[in-house]
């Protein structure tokens, strides 16, 4: 077998990994894990069309397996379908419910407003989509054949070829909770071949099966709403993300205290707090945290009077899905529900739907001397409604911009993080905007596992992998994590 990476090799976007089984044989079977969009610096030198092209052969791909529905993991799916892909698309039950919404929004924002074309794509997606419960083994389609032996090779972005006699005849898939966003999963693919005879030695028998684990995006420990991921029992080959492979997050109490302090300072300044956030995952975690702070500060007029505005119709749709799948929430969130609390809804919350209302809110906040918290996409400030807020308020000293998620190189969010503290500027909507706002970053709200979590994911396996492929990270993060893994295996 071999693994080929079509994205998330030199950065954190464009996740797309191909597992080839029996690749030395004419009976090759391939499985695609994610098919995401490139963003930020990883699109440099490419036209929009080039960024979206499916440049690899899809003829032998037997299935697409989706780990979760963030755009950097699913954004190229419409182009995969346009290239002729017509095989099963496997996803968890919650991801299968979210995915059509994500793809529809991505097409509207980045491709076309033609509802006929969009609906045709969604119909085709729904026809191929297969929802799978967590923990359920699903048999994958596979061509039967005998492959010739091969030895381990490793390249930076090319195939990783693993020893593979006597040929695999069965492949099965299981999703396990990843704790990243609703429906997110890491993937276990179990490959097996003809059973060895009783006279075969243990080494020969071991080669008749191989388990490959793809981490997708792993959630951070003690993140709100969703339970932390538990390590698989075993992995022979592991492909793992490394977004924060060189960093550890703040503790939950520290990040909550920092969030509270930032908001209270902004209220005293009568300023606007802008929080760029993904519509799926980060927005819901922030609402959960704000409800907790408001509940703990019942007698504090600051928190009883503050306006918290979610300016994103997509976020509102996804929040409804979070409520629908509350059976996937962690025990803490379920206890709050049992107490009659509503972790994703409270009196101070307003949701903005139409574009007209969006513009009206910006004009209103710009004309009054009143504090407010704005949560809007996109999470890396590469577009979406947050851009209009930044264009209007980034140059005001009373504004606070709060980053709670990873900002990829080449994105507006990374530029604001980098140049904001220096009194620099950015271009938004083709306008040069001086940064006079105060810029904050709270690492503890990241939905990605930190270095400690990533180490434990491997350390807690009973059968540790003999091969690890580190992806989805900047070079520094990948190297730092690799150094830690060398101590384990």
Model-identified regions with their sequence ranges:
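His/Asp/Glu-rich metal-coordinating catalytic cores
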Residues: 1-65, 70, 74, 79-285, ...
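Short, solvent-exposed amphipathic alpha-helical segments in soluble enzyme
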Residues: 19-22, 189-192, 229-232, 255, ...
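Short, compositionally biased "basic patch" segments
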Residues: 43-47, 224-237, 327-334, 407-434
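Conserved acidic residues
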Residues: 62, 236, 372, 399, ...
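A short acidic, amphipathic alpha-helical/loop segment
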Residues: 76-80, 226-227, 289, 385-392, ...
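Hard-cation-handling environments
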Residues: 260-412, 471
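Generic long, charged, amphipathic alpha-helical segments
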Residues: 426-457
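C-terminal structured "cap/appendage" subdomains that terminate the fold
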Residues: 457-485
């Amino acid at each position: 077998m071999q693994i080929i990476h079509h994205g998330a090799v030199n950065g954190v976007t464009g996740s797309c990994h191909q597992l080839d089984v029996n690749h030395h044989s004419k009976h090759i079977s391939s499985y695609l894990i994610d098919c995401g969009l490139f963003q930020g610096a990883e699109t440099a030198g490419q036209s929009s069309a080039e960024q979206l092209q499916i440049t690899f052969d899809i003829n032998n791909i037997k299935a697409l397996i989706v780990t979760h529905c963030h755009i950097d993991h699913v954004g190229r799916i419409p182009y995969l379908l346009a290239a002729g892909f017509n095989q099963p698309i496997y996803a968890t039950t919650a991801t299968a419910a979210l995915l059509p919404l994500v793809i529809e929004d991505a097409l509207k924002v980045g491709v076309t407003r033609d509802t006929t074309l969009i609906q045709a794509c969604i119909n085709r997606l729904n026809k191929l989509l297969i929802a799978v419960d967590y923990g359920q083994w699903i048999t994958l389609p596979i061509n039967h054949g005998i492959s010739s032996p091969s030895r381990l090779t490793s390249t930076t972005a090319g195939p990783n070829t693993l020893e593979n006699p006597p040929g695999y005849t069965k492949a099965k898939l299981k999703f396990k909770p990843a704790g990243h966003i609703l429906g997110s999963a890491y993937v276990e693919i179990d490959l097996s071949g003809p059973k060895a005879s009783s006279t075969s030695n243990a080494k020969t028998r071991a080669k008749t099966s191989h388990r490959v684990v793809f981490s997708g995006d792993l959630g951070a420990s003690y993140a709100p709403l969703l339970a932390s991921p538990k390590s698989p029992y075993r992995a022979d080959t592991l492909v793992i993300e490394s977004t924060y492979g060189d960093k550890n997050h703040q503790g939950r109490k520290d990040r909550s205290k920092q969030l509270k302090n930032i908001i209270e300072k902004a209220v005293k300044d009568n300023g606007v707090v802008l929080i760029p956030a993904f519509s799926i995952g980060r927005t819901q975690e922030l609402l959960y945290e704000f409800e907790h702070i408001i509940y703990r500060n019942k007698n504090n007029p600051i928190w009883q009077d503050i306006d918290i505005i979610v300016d994103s119709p997509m976020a509102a749709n996804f929040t409804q899905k979070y409520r629908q799948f509350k059976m996937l929430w962690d025990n803490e969130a379920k206890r709050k529900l049992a107490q009659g609390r509503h972790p994703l809804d409270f009196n101070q919350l307003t949701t903005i739907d139409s574009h007209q209302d969006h513009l009206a809110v910006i004009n209103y906040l710009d004309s009054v001397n009143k504090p407010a918290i704005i949560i809007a996409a996109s999470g890396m400030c590469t577009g979406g409604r947050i851009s209009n807020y930044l264009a209007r308020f980034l140059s005001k000293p009373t504004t606070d911009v709060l980053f709670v998620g990873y900002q990829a190189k080449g994105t507006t969010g990374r530029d604001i993080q980098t140049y904001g503290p220096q009194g620099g500027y950015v271009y938004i909507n083709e306008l040069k905007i001086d940064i006079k706002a105060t810029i904050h970053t709270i690492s503890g709200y990241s939905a990605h596992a930190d270095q400690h979590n990533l180490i434990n994911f491997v350390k807690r396996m009973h059968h540790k992998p003999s091969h690890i492929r580190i992806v989805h990270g900047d070079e520094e993060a990948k190297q730092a994590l690799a150094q830690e893994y060398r101590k384990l295996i």
